[in-house]
Design a protein with these regions (language model features):
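An active-site-proximal "capping" alpha-helix that borders the catalytic cofactor pocket
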Residues: 345-356, 418-434, 499-515
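Short, charged, surface-exposed loops that flank catalytic or proteolytic processing sites
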Residues: 413-414, 491-501
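Short acidic/His/Gly/Ser-rich catalytic and metal-binding motifs that mark active-site loops
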Residues: 399-405, 454-458, 486
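Acidic/His-rich, divalent-metal-binding segments that scaffold phosphate/diphosphate chemistry
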Residues: 294-420, 463
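Signal-transmission/dimerization alpha-helices at domain junctions
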Residues: 353-357, 401, 432-436, 483-489
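Histidine/acidic-rich helix-loop-helix segments that form or flank divalent-metal centers
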Residues: 106-109, 154, 370-393, 433-478, ...
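Non-catalytic interface/linker regions that flank or bridge core catalytic/transmembrane domains
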Residues: 1-346, 350-354
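Histidine-centered active-site/metal-ligand motif
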Residues: 343, 396, 425, 449-450
Length: 539
């Protein structure tokens, strides 16, 4: 259909939109990349035919698709993802700009898309909470304008207002260095209480449990207003988390079971003096989170639970007796991304074997790593290198948790934009490993395993090989990661299927460019090569 899109009949276009709707329908995400491709093509056609109603509708849905991609970027600094946020916001801003033609547009559905696009310009990350709040306030003013309401009385204005108040209630900043004005806090408090009271009414009418999410929003803003102490706020969050129905995977329960712990940890990160009093609670909380997540039905695709897991992966705090961050991440991968988990285990084991071979030949090879250099007993040093290499390999791809749907559910080659987005897994993986004591030393492997030895290609630019004391092990992880991906996932990267021998020959052709000559020299040793081959097979 794409080949003759400009000649397509209205019924065919409607069928294409229906197909796209099944790819991304809110709760389920089958293929958001293809969803965006379809709406980008439909938008081009609508621009060509100058169909204003279609342009507005397609801009809205393309923005929704791009927002879905942006939602995967939780935990990544705005500077690294501003381009993607701008691409999303431009779609909504262009559609919202048609507000000036609101009076002359006859189609009520199109008017609805204009208003929804206006509200959605506040989606995603902003440089400050105040900037986001300002955009939402402007939307509220538009939605409360009687002239607009009179012009389109058929639209669900109350619903639009409620959703925008909900957006405002979730805009509070949780940073210790508060970037909100006093008026910002007042505005958020008004919206939070409006939403909470409506949710209480709805839950009573439906005979449901009291709302948890909106209660937290109220508590958070009351804390910022000085109505609650931090201790009282944390205590109330604990009570909300204790209300989780572990047998239910409703949005409310998923929020309470996984997202609330993320906010709880964020407060403890911002106020570490509170941590000692709550270590025991935190240590008991993580197993509950994992138990709940692992019970999630495997045949269901719910992007919301992945979003909440990304939140908790970003704010996770280790304590002396809690599950380690590395183990927490591996538990998530086993359940939700088993292919990524297996790949990481293979890379870890093979990296450790190759590093052991190198160490036996050159005992000082890894001495740029301070803790390795400090070990004088060779047997102890050998074990330390093996363990270090294993952990670097096992954890090098933790950033892929942000892009679970792309790495584990897409049985097709990626689109160019998806290739670009998945490169962010190195940045987010590095950031997360770097913040926890048990994984800090392995962060370089997450950042640098896609860089090239000579620096001519690869990513990210923030990895500076010569300045990294872990570069020798990062080089090994990068080589083994490439071999395994080329061997077992060529379709994902658009490569033809190759056998092990062909892949090794290709690696040798990249000697001194992509791969360190110190490593490729080992690939010319038949005994070493056979050892690596057998490790791949057994792993």
């Amino acid at each position: 259909l794409f080949d003759r899109l400009f000649e397509a009949q209205p019924t065919e276009l409607a069928e294409l939109e229906e197909f796209a709707g099944a790819l991304l329908n809110g709760k389920n995400e089958l293929d958001s990349g293809l969803f965006c491709q379809i709406y980008q093509a439909l938008l081009s056609r609508a621009r060509h035919t100058k169909d204003r109603n279609a342009i507005i509708r397609y801009l809205y849905w393309l923005g929704i698709g791009r927002h879905n991609m942006c939602a995967k970027m939780v935990g990544i600094d705005l500077a690294d993802i501003e381009y993607y946020m701008s691409q999303m916001r431009l779609c909504f801003a262009e559609a919202a700009a048609y507000l000036k033609y609101f009076d002359e547009i006859d189609d009520v559905e199109t008017k609805g898309y204009i208003l929804r696009s206006r509200a959605n310009t506040a989606l995603g990350q902003f440089k400050s909470a105040s900037a986001k709040i300002r955009v939402i306030k402007q939307t509220l003013q538009i939605l409360q304008d009687k002239e607009y309401q009179k012009n389109a009385p058929e639209l669900p204005w109350d619903r639009y207002l409620y959703m925008t108040h909900q957006q405002m209630a979730s805009s509070i900043s949780y940073n210790r260095d508060n970037d909100m004005t006093a008026q910002d806090v007042v505005t958020i408090m008004e919206s939070a209480h409006i939403v909470h009271q409506q949710r209480i009414t709805e839950s009573l009418n439906k005979q449901e449990a009291p709302p948890i999410r909106t209660a937290f929003s109220c508590y958070a803003v009351e804390y910022y207003c000085g109505l609650l102490t931090l201790e009282e706020l944390l205590g109330r969050i604990e009570k909300l988390m204790n209300q989780v129905d572990t047998s239910s995977f409703s949005l409310e329960n998923m929020y309470a079971a996984i997202s609330l712990p993320a906010f709880y940890c964020q407060y403890l990160r911002e106020y570490p003096e509170q941590l000692s009093k709550r270590e025991k609670y935190l240590e008991n909380l993580y197993p509950k989170v994992l138990s709940y997540a692992e019970a999630f039905p495997k045949n269901e695709a719910n992007e919301q639970i992945f979003f909440y897991l990304r939140q908790l992966s970003t704010t996770f705090i280790e304590t002396p007796h809690s599950i380690s961050y590395g183990d927490f991440q591996q538990n998530i991968m086993i359940h939700f991304a088993p292919d990524v988990y297996v790949h990481s285990q293979v890379v870890g084991k093979t990296t450790a074997i190759l590093c052991d071979i190198i160490l036996l030949e050159e005992p000082n090879f890894f001495d740029d790593i301070e803790q390795i250099r400090a070990i004088t007993n060779f047997d102890a040093k050998r074990q330390a290198v093996y363990d270090f290499a294993m952990n670097c390999g096992v954890l090098h791809d933790v950033g892929k948790i942000n892009f679970i749907n792309l790495f584990s559910r897409t049985a097709r080659q990626w689109f160019d934009e998806e290739y670009e987005i998945t490169r962010l897994h190195t940045i987010v993986g590095h950031k997360r490993l770097d913040t926890c004591a048990s994984t800090h030393n392995y962060a370089a492997a997450a950042l640098g395993h896609h860089s090239w030895y000579d620096g001519s290609h690869g990513y990210p630019e923030t990895y500076k090989r010569l300045a990294c004391p872990y570069r020798q092990i990062v080089d090994v992880v990068g080589l083994i990661d490439w071999i395994d991906n080329t061997l077992n996932r060529p379709w994902l990267y658009g490569h033809p299927k190759k056998n092990f021998e062909e892949i090794i020959q290709e690696a040798l052709s990249l000697e001194g460019k992509r791969f360190s000559p110190l490593l490729t020299a080992r690939l010319r040793d038949s005994s070493v090569l056979e050892h690596i081959r057998q490790t791949f097979l057994s792993a």
